[in-house]
Amino acid sequence: MPKGERLFMASLDQIIDDFVFLDDWEDRYRYVIELGKALPELAEEKRTPENKVMGCASQVWLVTHTSGDPENPIMSFEGDSDAHIVRGLVAIVLATYSGKPASEIAALDAFEIFSKIGLVENLSSQRSNGLRSMVKRIREEAKVRAAA
């Protein structure tokens, strides 16, 4: 991955602010779709079984990159999905976790943030389970890397 490449278009703080600003869920869903459209497309060669997230109804791929201290590396992520809303959820997950040390990622439960903005409560059970699978995969990977 080239240095300085942006992995997502909006920061988590910006996403939270936008969610608070938007009044109804129809507008919020459109916003999630827009976040997905802004997400760089994952290269075809990275859409491998190893990068596929299990537990998602849609196809979702996550690729992890690390840099810095091998004992507590900074982790960044690329991701993609074949479904519009899920692609937006991938963008939110990447905004939440990318660019942080592995130990911080392992300790950060994104579902507290997602609940605060009402995201989890307004997703179908399939999408909510997929979101949980993405978060679980990232946090488990971070725990392994932080313990290395």
UniProtKB/Swiss-Prot annotation:
InterPro entries noted in UniProt: Fe-S_metab-assoc_dom
Family, similarity comment: Belongs to the SufE family.
A Pfam cross-reference name: SufE
Lineage of origin: Bacteria, Pseudomonadati, Pseudomonadota, Alphaproteobacteria, Hyphomicrobiales
Full protein name: Uncharacterized SufE-like protein RHE_CH01250
